[in-house]
Design a protein with these regions (language model features):
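Adenylate-forming AMP-binding core of the ANL superfamily, especially NRPS adenylation
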Residues: 39, 113-137, 142-158, 244-254, ...
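Conserved coil-to-alpha-helix start sites within the AMP-binding
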Residues: 60-71, 86-90, 177-195, 207-211, ...
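Adenylate-forming
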Residues: 61, 178-181, 205-206, 220-254, ...
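Short, Asp-centered acidic motifs that coordinate Mg2+ and/or phosphate
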Residues: 94, 102-103, 173, 223-224, ...
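Conserved AMP-binding/adenylation subdomain of ANL enzymes
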Residues: 144-173, 179-223
Length: 297
């Protein structure tokens, strides 16, 4: 699995480079710590016979923990479905049963995992093995799940290339504001980690507090984030230190900020990687979805 192999090599070369930061708690994990801790998750899952085509549900507190677990799950060759801790119990139970999950990983299980020795390497996987399940909100009925294969990880990395450059780069600090179960979260975090960038996880309430949002953007030196076009227009005066914005998920219209590279990304839950992209050069009443991403569509 190229993504995991590349991440392992990067972690060895840049052991102290920040990989994950929780903006709320200030918890920081370096690439070396992330790889070591995910190896403990891998070790736990391997001992419990959880590997290829087995699904686990991740429900750890929003911050660094869900990503430690997710990486460990992928190193074990298993699959994950992520839910937020504030999900309604009925919805959570339904997703657990519908996904066929064999393990529920909350903060207590996470702490148990951290007592295990760290396993090196990873299990072999096929690009068509199950890696992730993404569920809809269920506002029109029961949540519906989409199965994602390991191949999407490599496609997501290839889709990070726009024309002749990478959108997410090693120097970037990504503000993660999206729900953990959203496709956009995978679209943003996998390329960021692959390139050696830093992910700063914001609480879901931060975007509702403009002053706190601005404070976090400046305090954590955020250079890139995902926002809908509506949020961009509402908060454009607070984004002066941001260099790049990824937008999508709804109709993109009348979006342009001089001095900030804004990329309109077209994707789907069924794909979970960038299909088309456009670097916005002016305001459009209806922004084009752009051209197919290099090697991904």
């Amino acid at each position: 699995m190229a993504f995991i192999d590349d991440l392992e090599e990067y972690s060895k070369r840049h052991t102290q480079k920040p990989a994950l930061i929780s903006a709320d708690t200030g918890t920081r994990l370096s690439y070396g710590e992330l790889y070591n801790m995910s190896g403990k998750v891998y070790s736990y899952l391997k001992e419990h016979g959880i590997g290829r085509e087995k699904v686990v549900m991740i429900c750890a507190t929003r911050g660094v923990r869900p990503f430690v677990v997710l990486l460990g799950v992928w190193r074990a060759g298993a699959a994950a479905v992520i839910v937020e801790t504030d999900f309604a119990k009925e919805r959570m139970n339904y997703i657990y049963e519908d996904s066929g999950s064999v393990l529920f990983i909350d903060d207590n299980v996470f702490m148990e995992m951290m007592d295990y020795p760290s396993q090196i390497g990873h299990e072999p996987t096929d690009p068509h093995d199950l890696a992730l399940l993404v569920y809809t909100s269920g506002t029109t009925g029961k949540p519906k799940g989409v199965l994602q294969e390991y191949g999407i990880l490599e496609m997501g990395i290839k889709g990070n290339v726009y024309e002749d450059h990478h959108v997410m780069e090693e120097s970037d600090r990504l503000a993660l504001t999206t729900p953990l179960n959203f496709t956009a979260t995978i679209l943003m975090t996998v390329p960021t980690l692959h390139e050696g960038g830093t992910i700063v996880v914001f609480s879901r309430d931060v975007a509702k507090n403009p002053q706190l949002f601005k404070k976090y953007i400046e305090e954590y030196h955020i250079s890139i984030l995902f926002m809908t076009s509506m949020m961009i227009n509402l908060m454009k005066n607070m984004l002066t230190s941001v260099k790049k914005i990824i937008t999508g998920g709804e109709l993109v219209k009348n979006v342009y900020i001089d001095g900030i590279d804004i990329y309109c990304i077209y994707s789907q839950s069924e794909a979970c990687f960038h299909l088309c992209a456009l670097k916005i050069d002016k305001e459009y009443e209806v922004t084009p979805i752009g051209k197919p991403c290099v090697e991904s569509a």
